[in-house]
Every structure is written in C-alpha cells, then in structure tokens.
Amino acid sequence: MVTEQDPTTLMKQQVGKAAAEEVKSGMIVGLGTGSTTAYMIQFLGELLQRGELKDIKGIPTSFQSTVLAKKYGVPLTTLDEVDYMDIAIDGADEVDPQKNLIKGGGAAHTREKIVDCLAEKFVVVVDSSKLVDKLGSTFLLPVEVIPMAMNPVIRAIEKLGGQPEVRMGVKKAGPIVTDQGNLVIDVKFDSIDNPGELEKSLNNIPGVLENGLFVGVADVILVGEIDNGKPIVRTIS
C-alpha cells in the first residue's frame, strides 16, 4: 500500500495518471518502459474498463510494457499493422532544459527511440528528480552494442572521451541482454556539451545499434512534484 511517506511513488502515480488522460478514444499509443510509465499503462486499463476510453491500441516498447498492457487489458498492435501513431508516452532518466533526454535505464532505449520518434506527439513522464541542468550529470549514457563488437566499440568510445563499462545483471550472472539480444555499455562523459553531435558520433561507430540520447524528440514533459506535501503535475511544453 502506498503511504504519504512514499513521495516518489506518489509523484509517479500522479504523473502516470495525467499522462493516461492525454490519450483519447481511437488513438494508437506508444507504450513506454519504466516505473512511471507502468502507472500510465495501469491507468489506461482502468479508463478502458470504466468505458471512458474506447478503441485504443498500444504499441509496446519492451517486454515489460507488453506484459503490463496484457495485465491491465490494453489492446496491442505492431508497427507492421499501423502507418500512424497518435501519441507515445515514455519515461526518462534525465531531462535537460531543452527537453533533451537520456533514456535506457531499462535497456529498452532502442525500441523506445523507434516508437517515440514515429509518434505525432511524444509525452515524457518523470518525477522531479530527473530534471538536470546538463545531460550526464547524474546518469550514465547507455549504448546498445552487438556482442561481437563490444571491445572495438569500447575503444572507439574511449577515443570520444567516454569512460565505458559493460552493464552487468543484478541477480543474474553475466551482462544484461536487451530484448534484441545485444549488450549495453554505460558511458560516463565528463561533460555532454552537444548532445545532438554526440548522439550521431556514437551511432556512427560500427557495432552500435543505438544510444540513449533523445535530442529534439520530446514535445511535452509531465513532471511529478510534491507541493505542500501533496503530489502535483507540472507541464513543460
């Protein structure tokens, strides 16, 4: 049970609910990955059950969002079956003042970037702890890599000034494996002064599938905050 002593969860629930209310009947919805987005999927299911939403279909960005959508009764489709997506709702690990993002804490950033970039509107849901002045301040930058290219990619990233390390599993022996069967390298940069340039440079390394920089993609940021002991949602557009 959630209590008032758990402000982070309260913020995530509130912003997840606000994001679900952005969805209208008949929409195709990109379903993001992460703890805040999980509440959004739950609230979408509740709106469908109450009849307040009808005829929506979700496109999941990960195995996690697929499982949650099925659990809460959100119908699913695929990019093969639709040629238009009304809205994508997803979380982020960092958000800078220009609405650029670092994503990939859940190792799903490749699928997330595909879905989020295809949507007509991309809404980001975060709690206030994810707001930073400069990307890379608190979170390492994830890079998805084809396994055979891991060592060459590490060397190339070091030449770009990064400090890379392979992400290892928790309660699992060995590295994290993505839904695509690849590895994730988490990279520390002393300063990410030009996120757009770095995003392109990393993706130009042979063996890199995608990195967690999302530059110029987000349309709206919904931020969960605590004001006078109560959770509120602030909109950055």
From Swiss-Prot:
**One GO-annotated biological process of the protein:** pentose-phosphate shunt, non-oxidative branch
Signal peptide, first to last residue:
none
Keywords, comma-separated and alphabetical: Isomerase
According to its UniProt record, which reaction does this protein catalyse? aldehydo-D-ribose 5-phosphate = D-ribulose 5-phosphate
- Write the Enzyme Commission number(s) for this entry: 5.3.1.6
Q: Return the similarity comment.
A: Belongs to the ribose 5-phosphate isomerase family.
- Name of the protein this chain belongs to: Ribose-5-phosphate isomerase A
Give the originating organism. Answer: Trichodesmium erythraeum (strain IMS101)
Q: Coding gene? A: rpiA
